[in-house]
Amino acid sequence: MSDETFVITGAMLADGSRTDLLLAGGRIQETGVRLSAAGATVVDADGLLALPGLVDLHTHLREPGYEQSETVLTGTRAAAAGGFTEVFAMANTSPVADTAGVVEQVLSLGEAAGYATVRPIGAVTVGLEGERLAELGAMADSRARVRVFSDDGKCVSDPLLMRRALEYVKAFDGVIAQHAQEPRITAGAQMNEGALSGELGLAGWPAVAEESIIARDVLLAEHVGSRLHVCHVSTAGSVDVIRWAKARGIDVTAEVTPHHLLLTEELVSGYDARYKVNPPLRRSEDVEALRAGLADGTIDIVATDHAPHPVEAKDCEWDAAAFGMVGLESALSVVQSSVVDTGMLGWADIARVLSATPARIGRLAGHGTPVEAGAPAELFLYDPAAAREFSTGELAGKGVNSPYLSMTLSGRVVATFHRGYATVLDGAVLESVGGARG
């Protein structure tokens, strides 16, 4: 329970209305005009949006095992900087998060850090090897209460194993989050397959490698009657398959990353490994289809796929470089530039695709709720009129492998509140936060 009190004055909500907010005891105690409270810290929100804390269903925090890239502490600091109050941590750690013990360790690390709620994602298969199911039930029954399972970074390519996983998690309303990539079609692939990959002499990554797995898995989900979530959709064909599945009544949800909403394969022409990512940057036609799919509800959410790497893993030849980009700090600005400034989505839509719906998919209570009296004090203040050149100084985690460095981005997170505590004030991540436990 928070013992900090804040009065936020003149904030604009997602529906366009203006209000003051009184935060105390870890909740939004009151909304209205000219609010005050003894001893409260007053935060002037004139011209700022007050939005529900963002929820990222797809984050790589790297701990345990890869602390040179990121830790739960540094990753959640990056999350707070981007307006996130809750993140789901992918399982590709060392040891892999395929047991109750490892997911409980990740949960405890998040509680100790205090910058955001951390919900571990459990591996689907032991060691992410795709050979036998991990301890799905034990992770679901653990203190971490895991409900999302993924081998992200690898595809559950065996259809029988995927069927069994869908059947297993159905018993406790879990969901399989599939990294849709047929490995036999993408062996050695380095960028999107097309004319440009031929010109650059880089092995191509065909769209059908993603689309074929999604087509298979939506049919499996329909057969089993279980929930399926598709990670980082990147092609127009994938949007078509998901749209067809939803029209058929299949229980499938899907995410798109900020970078796939903005960046295209042409950026690879300079062989700058900051633009090397899995799935790869695609054609402008794919970007347009992804934006349209998000706008019409075919794609349910935006998720960052925040993937930090040490400098040496990116500052090298393209073929040797690691796949992945950092994205927590820049996510909302990129989404604003892609679909808000272009008139495709409004701020109420942003609250839905970056907060309410990811919380619902992850079965997370107390997050993604509207900014209103009685709700948990999980929110952030955002200046949509700001514009700035994105720089490494804005990166609060360990990773500096951002594709947006030196780009002009819209908007800026001014303050973030988690469990009623401030984690960001005046645009800066606080060095210590009151919400830490353990």
UniProtKB/Swiss-Prot annotation:
What pathway does the annotation place this protein in?
A: Pyrimidine metabolism; UMP biosynthesis via de novo pathway; (S)-dihydroorotate from bicarbonate: step 3/3
Does Metal-binding count among this protein's keywords?
yes
* Cellular component GO terms held in the UniProt record: cytoplasm
Its keywords, alphabetically, are: Hydrolase, Metal-binding, Pyrimidine biosynthesis, Zinc
Residues bound to Zn(2+) 2 are D152, H179, H232
Q: Which residues take part in binding Zn(2+) 1?
A: H58, H60, D152, D305
Quote the CDD domains the UniProt record gives.
DHOase_IIa
UniProt protein name:
Dihydroorotase
Protein source organism:
Leifsonia xyli subsp. xyli (strain CTCB07)
